[in-house]
A protein has these predicted regions:
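Periplasmic-binding protein-like
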Residues: 119-125, 202-242, 261-278
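Short helix-initiation/N-cap motifs at beta->coil->alpha
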Residues: 75-87, 132-135, 169-184
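A ligand-binding cleft/hinge motif common to bilobed small-molecule-binding domains
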Residues: 84, 100-109, 160-161, 188-219
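Extended ligand-binding regions for polar small-molecule ligands
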Residues: 57-70, 130, 138, 144, ...
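Alpha-to-beta junction loops
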Residues: 36-37, 72-74, 91-99, 144-146, ...
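Ligand-binding clefts/hinges and TM-proximal coupling segments of bilobed small-molecule sensing domains
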Residues: 25, 154-169, 208-210, 242-278
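Bilobed "Venus flytrap"/periplasmic-binding protein-like clamshell domains
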Residues: 37, 42-45, 53-69, 123-174, ...
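Extracytoplasmic small-molecule ligand-binding "clamshell" domains
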Residues: 24-100, 109
Length: 278
């Protein structure tokens, strides 16, 4: 199915929607003929607006295709800062978070997540040659280095939990600002998802990817689509459709351009487990 994915400025997308079978504010919007608003930031590979202004990235692709399998194609992308995604969902500025958000216990208090759609570790970007030998959170802690990461990223909480001082955690809006801080010497390392780190390292000669094999095991996480707690009925239907789609040849062909491979499938891990253990 060919699905248009234009930004808000292009207007509402006219399409048919599924018969009302769920309860909750999202289903109320669907019943009223309104769009399903998907919220995401500008995160390479995961969820971002491409040069044509369309919703792109593998988490957007998965969410949109699952919705389509439910008969729902009236989708309206909403782009914002990463740190505003959960507040925006709760304030009903959009209906789903499709930016590739990790399932964390602290987030599960505010968001109802779908079953996982991907697994990924954290990655570290350093200056070319890695002069400080930084390959893990522990290296940042022991060397009292300055790390830069995104405001609202899981990496902030991870660093704090390990004992890295807040003064050594620089928070910026996103990947572009992280690279700028690293290049300017304001930070010794940039910490973000391994997906993003690999993508950025390939685009900038002045920086490189640290040795991901040295990253702590607890930094491996699972991403899912975020819903409001009030939309549990719709979420159950989404999960049923997701189960039929995840890992299929159709899906893997769709997301291959975003470097998603079988290694990134979540396996048997459930959102319930991730909420309790991450």
């Amino acid at each position: 199915m060919n699905i248009t994915k234009g930004l808000i400025a292009t207007g509402f997308l006219m399409a048919t929607t599924a018969t009302s079978v769920f309860a909750g504010p999202l289903q109320d919007r669907i019943d009223a003929g309104e769009t399903i608003r998907i919220g995401f930031a500008n995160i390479p590979l995961w969820g971002y607006p491409n040069e044509a202004g369309d919703a792109d990235g593998f988490t957007n692709d998965i969410a949109i295709e699952v919705l389509a399998s439910m008969g729902l194609t009236n989708v309206e992308p909403v782009v914002g800062d990463w740190g505003g995604l959960i507040p925006g969902l709760k304030a009903e500025r959009f209906d789903l978070i499709t930016g590739g958000m990790y399932v964390l216990g602290s987030r599960c208090e505010n968001v109802s997540f779908s079953e996982p759609v991907a697994r990924s570790g954290d990655g570290i970007l350093v200056a070319a040659g890695n002069p400080e030998g930084i390959n893990s959170y522990t290296d940042v802690l022991n060397g009292e280095h300055i790390m830069v990461t995104g405001a609202g990223y899981n990496t902030v909480e991870a660093a704090q939990n390990l004992g890295i001082a807040d003064a050594n955690i620089m928070q910026v809006p996103g990947p572009t600002e992280m690279v700028a801080a690293l290049k300017a010497g304001r930070a010794n390392a940039a910490v973000l998802t391994d997906f993003e780190a690999q993508h950025l390292a390939a685009d900038h000669d002045e920086i490189e990817l640290g040795d991901s094999s040295q990253m702590e095991e607890w930094s491996k996480n699972f991403a899912a689509i975020g819903f409001r707690h009030e939309d549990q009925d719709f979420l159950a239907g989404f999960n049923a459709a997701l189960k039929d789609y995840l890992g299929t040849e159709e899906m893997m062909a769709k997301v291959a351009e975003h470097e998603y491979s079988e290694l990134h499938l979540p396996g048997d891990v459930t959102t319930e487990w991730a909420c309790a253990n991450r």
